[in-house]
Each structure stands twice: as C-alpha cells, then as structure tokens.
C-alpha cells in the first residue's frame, strides 16, 4: 500500500554525520555537467542515480529539515539487514573486511565473482535476492573464501562469534550450502511459512503458534485495532512465546537511538504541525507502543500542507509471510509543485470515482475522507526503500485510519524520470511489442500512462472500498498483499480508459489507456519472467499480482479473443485485440477482488492467486530469458543517494549542498562505516 508499484509498467521498459564545509559553493554546479544516470551494472542489477530538482529553491529551514531527516533515514540501515536474515550483518561485515583489507590479486575471475557477490548483498540488504527472495549462489569456491578470510587481520573481522575460525564455521555453510536458508520469504501453499522462510521476524516459532498468538491478542469488534505484532520479533524462550519489541530500550536500540537523535534535531526546525508529528514518532520509538504509532500516522496523514515530508518506521509487511511484521524503511522528499496539480485533481474527484466504481454498492465508501495526493522528488532513500525503491507510496496501512482519516498518496517523479532516462533506446519495445501501433503508442504515451497508473493506484485504488462489518482485514493471510496490490491495479486500469480522465484534463486521449493496457498485459503474462530464475515459481508480491491480473483477463476473454498470444518468426508476443472489452473485464475482476477483501474470503483469494499468479510456463520462460539476454538489459534497478553536506559560517549552518558519490561501492562502504550501529547478533 503500500509501497506499491516498484516499477510496474516501467518494468517493461527497464524491466554519524558527514563533515561540514566552510566555503559555500553554488548549488548549480551539480546540474551543469552532463548527468550520468547509470552508476554501475552487475549480474541482473543496474544501479542508477537520481536528480533532486528544486532542492536549491527550498528555504534554509526546509533544507535543514531534509538534512536531519536524511541522517535519521540512513541511521537505520542495519535494521533491515538483520530483519531480512539473522546472519546478514556478520556476513556483510566479513565480506566488507575482505574487500577493504585484501592485498592479493584483484584481477582474477574468483575475485571478480567475490566482488559481484558483495555488490549483490549490498543491493538486497542481505544474502537473498531482493525480489525473488532466493538465496544467492556464490560463484567463487569455499577454498578461495578461506584464503580471503585468512588474509584479513583478525581485529578487522566481526567478533560476535569469537575467533575467525568460529566465525567462518557459522557463516561459511550459510553462504555455500544451498539447502540452508534457501528462501527469505516462502509463500508456498501447504508449507509452514515461518519454518521454511529465512526472514528474521520469528525465532523458533511455527506458523500455527504465531497465528494463534496474535489471534488471542485481537479484540473482536474493536473499531480501532492496533497493528498487532508490527514492531517486534516473536520468539520462543523457555517454551513460552514472547515479543522482543523494537524500541530504544529494546531490540535494535543502538540504531533506534540514533534515529531518535536526528528526529529530535529535525523537530527543532520543523513547523508546529510537523513538530507534533515527529514527536509522536519519537514517542513510538521510545515506548514501542503501537497506539503511539497510530497517533503518529493520524497526525502524519492530516498534514497535507508541508513542503517537506518523510516516511520513517516499521511500515510494510511484505517481508513477513504472515503479514504481521513490518520492515524498517525511510524516505525523505519534497513536493514537485507543478506535477502535484494532476494528483490534486484526482483527489478532489475521489468521491466521483468511488461512486462509479464497478464494485458492489455495499462495499463502496459512502463518504471518501481525507484523500490527499502529491507528486514528490525523493531526497534520500533508506532501509527497505534502498537501493531498490518504489515509484509510488500510499499510507498509512491501517484500514480504520484510512476510513476515518484518509490516506496520503505520492508518486515519486525523480525516480520515475531516472528509470525512463536510463532505459531509452535499449531495444525492449522493438523486441517484445509485436504491433507497430502498440509500439508507437507506448513510445508516445508510455511515461504519461505509467505516471497516471501510479497516481490512480496509490491515490484512489488503495483508498477505495470498505470492509464488511466484522471483517478485521487480516483474513487473507499470505495472499492479502497480492490481492491488495491487484485491487489497486485493477482500479487504476479500469479508470485509465474512462472518459472522465479526458474530461478532467488528466489524459490527452484514449490512446494513453491503450498503451498502458498493451504494456501491462504483455508484462504480466510474459516479459516480467525475465526477473525469474528458470524453473522457479513467481514469489514476489507485485509480480504475482501482475501475472494474476493478466492471466485471469486472458482466460476470461479467451472466447472472444480479447487477448491473443501471437507467434511470428518463432517469437511469442502478447496482443490486446479489444481494448474496450478488456476494460469491461477489468471492472468484473475488480468487483470480485473487492468482494474477496471486503468479506475476508480466504479460499477464493487463495484460489485466484495460486491459479493465475504463481506457476510459470517453462517453454515461454526459456524464450523470454533468451530474448531478454540478447538485449543486455538488467531487469532490476536501484539507486545510490546524493550526499548532503552542511555549509557552515561562524558555527552556524547557512546552507545545505549536495553532490553524488563516485561509485556504488564507495557509497556502500561509506554507509557501512558511518551508519552501522547494531551488533552482528541482535
């Protein structure tokens, strides 16, 4: 919700404080040189950087607020590594110690393989792929790893397990044995989702035990339920289940104390409204009280006027197969005032869209409250938003807060710009889009359509509809996130082709919707398979969502050939033959997905996801991988951050300026040096 849309249709195109300086330098220097969008490429990853347009025009207090919030965003980096897997931190630190201290030959194939492995670990915030969640397979030998570790002075290695020998006895099997911790998040039907997942939100606890534990906590009929379990690790100690709460005197305390320090600095330069919001977040971090988290979210969602805004906290539950526990993430941003006008039009007409939605009337909101939307430029990415980041966000996640106070939706303009600019001329459209008219539409309207899809998905899709009386919202369990993303996507797809979009001046004509439909269906049924290892099922939430929608629409429209698989010169393409009928199908599908969510119909939701969103046609998969590989395109992208530095005069900050890191490796090592506050074992 909510972190919606991590490159959605764009996947089709590409599929401690810093030192201060005394001399004020003109900010324009950052923009005068030709901008380098691509910083690094390795394996299936392309690392980009993003512009920060308009930063120089902010007031000094706004710049200082961004700077302090940036420091808070970077201070939690270790948390997401540890949440993803309990051995990520000692492994990362061992690899970094090798990289910075090894004095041997750095030109060999095995060294290059080691370097690639380290870059992948940085990118994924751990040893499991950030998207598929499969464990990485090192392309260097255990013997070579032993040689590398032996070359590092003992004092440079993590000491949490004792000697270097004791350290490697633990981490070496974890790295090299494919049977150990093979997947970070397992969603396979019939498995114990906790015991078969490597994520670190539970320790020694079975799925049945966890579900029963939180079922006992829930208060039936509570109109304002807290998000039980959101900010804790559930463990079994002496045979008894207990929560280790993430707070400044609990688990992750050293990092959370640093985050709070910088939030306190931010509160000093914030407006009165934002100061109250930040202080509520500080209270939540200090107490771990989820009622304080709700208070923070209510204050945050009601603040729609601030130029500078942020996300900081335990937010999204995609990393927990049961959907209780949230990863730590952060993002600091400020408004793009010109682009925000389009989202203001959408939010101003939210009631019209709700009233005309094809869902059952009883599941429509009678009064849409507090829908706010804006277009932003990211200033920093952190935690689970870094290096891979969403292009749109809709928060808060609690259904009762959304119903009573509304939601805040953002489209991240400078991130979508970086994706688009870095993907120009890569040959993708020519290879996978069969019809010339579809190619032309996507070339002309693809970016407009992607941005509008994101706006509708985040601003209206997630905020639409309501639960039936007595439904809590967690009944769909491991399928809840997929179905929620599908609900928002279907809402967006349905309205993309509505005449209201042209009437409101949001889209120039119906060709934009056709471009979006053609690219979305092709991506969902086919081209996103470039992101999946051959022989694997689809595991990632957004990919399951897109495949489910596309395959379901294909089957529903099969009799009338609404969508067609075309084979020409041995190459498969997906073609939409009837855009109007496809829109009608999207409406029917939205009606059913909303019913499933509103009623908490686990069986129907499970059957939809498992039937259409998981399994992969091996022959088609092989074809996609072969064709995609010939283009030399990396299917995943992420980012390095700008580096912000205070300009000092007489001991006072008089400006904040920014520059870009020299390399991806430089930034990762810098962050590990200056923002690593947790022990290796937590």
Regions found by a protein language model. Give the residues of each.
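C-terminal motif of bacterial Sec signal peptides marking the signal peptidase cleavage site
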Residues: 16-19
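N-terminal-proximal low-complexity accessory segments that begin disordered
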Residues: 30-94
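An active-site-proximal "capping" alpha-helix that borders the catalytic cofactor pocket
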Residues: 59, 271, 481-498
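Long, well-structured alpha-helical subdomains associated
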Residues: 80, 493-599
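Contiguous, non-catalytic segments that form substrate-binding/exosite surfaces or channel walls
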Residues: 123-235, 241-440, 446
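Catalytic Zn2+-binding segment of zinc metalloproteases
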Residues: 459-471, 495, 499
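Post-HEXXH active-site segment of zinc metalloproteases
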Residues: 465-486
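Extended, compositionally biased alpha-helical segments that mediate assembly or anchoring
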Residues: 578-682
